[in-house]
Amino acid sequence: MLGGLLALLASATFALSNVTARRGVLTGSVLQALVVTIWLGVPVFLAAALVAGELGAVARIPLPSIAYLALAGMLHFVFGRYCNFRAISAIGVNLAGPVQETSLLVSLALAVWLLGEMLTGLKILGIVLVLLGPAIILRVLRQERAAADDPKSGQAASDDLSKTKFQPRFAEGYIFAALSALAYGMSPILVRAGLRGTDPGTGIAGGLISYAVAALIVAPMLFHSATRRDILALRFPAAKWFTAAGIMVCLSQMVRYMALSIAPVTIVTPIQRLSVIFRLFFSWMINRDHEVFRLGVLGGMFVTLIGALALTLHTEFVLSLVPLPALVIEAAGWRWPGGR
């Protein structure tokens, strides 16, 4: 129960961090966002570890677990976050989000293969829906692009596109969204491997290790003159949003690490997919002129959300809500690996 609640909190704060980062990259650069959010992580996690009295837990974590946590920091906080910021800069949070939901498939496959966790028939249905959501969105966008190229309907499409000030860069956005999904799908396995059998306090110490390694990886970038000029060119409007994003993502990662210390990947990661709905809400509140809110896009997000719920809820709970045929009950309760 506690692991699920922590995962839900991680979902909401991660969504808010994405939305505030999206606002920042309108006037700042992706590298600026990366450096600010990573370097903020070390003092935030250090302060949290001191307040919780868990700083000493760093020394108690065995070396193999430290290696897993260090790899998670490099993969998630450096590579994954860079790709995430490139994606939301190019196509916005609403279009990048459903593609990034496929990270769930990576996490679940690796959890079954490497950690010995299990899937049910209901969870497999959820996987199908999580894949279907981005497919719906891509189909809608292809139809709109075809309409824009059609002289007979070009004016109507043009009028529709003019309702938003934002013009997506689709190829760049979807490539980096897919890369971030791969990184975000692999990192929970590393975190769980490093923290399994511990407690939420040790999760904070584990997050400090991951952030410290990520900060060390990013630090040499300052020796490159062009990168240094880019980072030093950061101005207040973007700095304000990047700082907010950094604080929110630190809180998100903190409770995520705490959740993964006490709950399996197949519980924590699906619950985090509820960030789809949080992203939609926060985007409307903060970035409505810089996002895509077309009906087909919202429909794809809704399908993805239903898939995430199917992956999150216990099969027994769902079957208790509605009387279903015996064949459906048997299919929903099927388990893999292991069958019934």
Where are these regions (language model features)?
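Hydrophobic/small/kink-forming positions within alpha-helical transmembrane segments
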Residues: 15, 46, 74-78, 104-109, ...
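Aromatic-anchored segments of alpha-helical transmembrane domains
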Residues: 185, 305-312
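Alpha-helical transmembrane segments
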Residues: 69-73, 119-133, 202-214
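C-terminal transmembrane-helix exit sites in multi-pass transporters
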Residues: 105-125, 135-137, 141, 277-299
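Membrane-helix interface/capping residues of multi-pass secondary transporters
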Residues: 30-31, 93, 119, 200-203, ...
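Membrane-interface interhelical linkers
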Residues: 1-31, 36-71, 81-91, 139-178, ...
